């Protein structure tokens, strides 16, 4: 019987590269792994409105480089680079009224932290950003069919080779949960050289949580060099 496989993990080492780049043994491996998970989760929560497509972490010696991929680099960098400094060192004790508190990436690791912000130029064809956009619309009580169809048509218009969108939950406030799927173009999940992006988001509505999944096909990668987030 076939099993579901994560499209990204299925292609790691073939056409995709790891989102954490470092090597350690024993207890240090566990320590760094948990640090990476906490750092990525904290950044996603703190910069929720900045359209974060992904976070990569590179470690060498006593340094940790955190690469943030975003469709809104200006919001992350901030005025005069203040946002970068807040990401690195936090704003606890210095935050202004109404500002979200963030402990800083440095509080999660003993390494010296460097922040690098990379712009995602086409948010319309980034699977994670598309999934979060649909989830946001569902939370605003926009009809799920309208949100899904618009995301599919926009992605194809901006150059995607294929897209599949799946929403599951109490769609439209119905009594029973169900699954709705929209698809356009090719989405070859079994082809290893196919550049498939996968995005997952949750819409927290009054009737419950609605899960949103997006698969985006961007074409076939013929060269051997692994690709990172785009």
UniProtKB/Swiss-Prot annotation:
KH type-2 domain sequence ranges: 39-121
Any Pfam family the entry gives: KH_2
A GO molecular function held by the record: rRNA binding
Record-linked CDD domains: KH-II_30S_S3
A Gene Ontology biological process term: translation
Domain of life: Bacteria
Record flagged with keyword Transit peptide: no
GO cellular component, one term: cytosolic small ribosomal subunit
Keywords: Ribonucleoprotein, Ribosomal protein, RNA-binding, rRNA-binding
Function: Binds the lower part of the 30S subunit head. Binds mRNA in the 70S ribosome, positioning it for translation.
Family note: Belongs to the universal ribosomal protein uS3 family.
Subunit structure: Part of the 30S ribosomal subunit. Forms a tight complex with proteins S10 and S14.
Protein's UniProt name: Small ribosomal subunit protein uS3
Biological source species: Sorangium cellulosum (strain So ce56) (Polyangium cellulosum (strain So ce56))
Taxonomic classification: Bacteria, Pseudomonadati, Myxococcota, Polyangia, Polyangiales
């Amino acid at each position: 019987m076939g099993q579901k496989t994560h499209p990204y993990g299925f292609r790691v080492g073939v056409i995709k590269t790891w989102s954490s780049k470092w090597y350690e043994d024993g207890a240090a491996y566990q320590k760094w792994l948990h640090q990476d998970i906490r750092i990525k989760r904290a950044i996603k929560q703190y910069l929720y409105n900045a359209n974060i497509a992904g976070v990569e972490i590179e470690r060498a010696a006593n340094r940790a480089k955190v690469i943030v991929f975003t469709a809104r680099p200006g919001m992350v960098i901030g005025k005069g680079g203040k946002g970068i400094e807040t990401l690195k060192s936090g704003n606890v004790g210095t935050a202004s009224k109404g500002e979200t508190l963030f402990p800083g990436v440095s509080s999660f690791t003993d390494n010296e932290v460097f922040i690098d912000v990379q712009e995602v130029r086409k948010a319309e064809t980034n699977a994670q950003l598309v999934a979060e956009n649909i989830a946001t619309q569902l939370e605003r009580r926009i009809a799920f069919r309208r949100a899904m169809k618009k995301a599919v048509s926009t992605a194809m218009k901006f150059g995607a080779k294929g897209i599949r969108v799946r929403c599951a939950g109490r769609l439209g406030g119905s009594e029973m949960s169900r699954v709705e799927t929209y698809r356009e173009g090719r989405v070859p999940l079994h082809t290893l050289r196919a550049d498939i992006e996968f995005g997952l988001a949750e819409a927290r509505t009054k009737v419950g949580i609605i899960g949103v999944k997006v698969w985006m096909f961007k074409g076939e990668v013929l060269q051997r060099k692994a690709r990172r987030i785009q």
